[in-house]
Design a protein with these regions (language model features):
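C-terminal motif of bacterial Sec signal peptides marking the signal peptidase cleavage site
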Residues: 4-7
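Charged C-terminal helix
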Residues: 165-173
Length: 197
């Protein structure tokens, strides 16, 4: 998983920042359960950016996951599952002075199709989103991922969903894409909830 650092606006933006995942391989679904329109630019329902990461929850199984990045630095993310299916992943914020992870929510990766923002969720058709919201910015990053930015909410789309040659962009610098063309069945693969600055 490629990650980049982004500032965390949780009341003291000088002290903390959140890692920003650029892709995820987890795809979760719970079938035909009713959707919950609880994604906002502040968090996912009761889970808010800047709040303490809970150790337990009555509705979810919680599992910390340790990974090592390209620079051999350990990072811990926290998976929230229901009935054995990962629903979302919490990324702790970082403390600038020590570069250590805090126990506060820095960002949330939604991988379940059960949560939406204004009706848009994992599995939503990308072309329908852009048609209904023509002013949303589309960016391309690192030959892997397109992002549709909507304030503190970013819809992530695999580059395989793009129709035509991929845009040329500087390495590791998100670049705006003018008049993007996605395949008819292009879908949102995950949703990243993050601080805005």
């Amino acid at each position: 998983m490629a990650v980049a650092l982004a500032a965390c606006n949780n009341g003291n933006p000088q002290d903390q920042k959140a890692i920003e995942p650029e892709s995820t391989t987890i795809q979760a679904t719970n079938g035909n359960l009713p959707k919950k329109d609880i994604i906002t630019n502040e968090g996912l329902g009761e889970f808010k950016i800047g709040d303490t990461i809970p150790d337990s929850h009555p509705d979810y199984d919680i599992k910390p996951v340790v990974s090592v990045d390209e620079e051999e630095m350990e990072e811990v993310t926290v998976e929230f599952s229901k009935d054995g299916v990962v629903q979302f992943i919490i990324y702790p914020s970082y403390i600038d002075e020590t570069d250590a992870q805090s126990n506060e929510i820095g960002g949330i990766m939604v991988v379940s199709d059960q949560f939406t923002h204004n009706g848009i969720g994992v599995g939503s058709n990308v072309n329908d989103i852009l048609k209904a919201n023509p002013n949303l910015e589309v960016t391309f990053y690192d030959d892997q991922l397109f992002r549709i930015n909507d304030g503190g909410i970013t819809y992530l789309i695999s580059s395989e969903a793009y129709d035509g040659p991929l845009p040329e962009v500087p390495f590791d610098i998100p670049a705006p894409v003018e008049n993007p063309t996605f395949k008819p069945d292009a879908k949102v693969s995950s949703i990243w909830i993050h601080p805005t600055f």
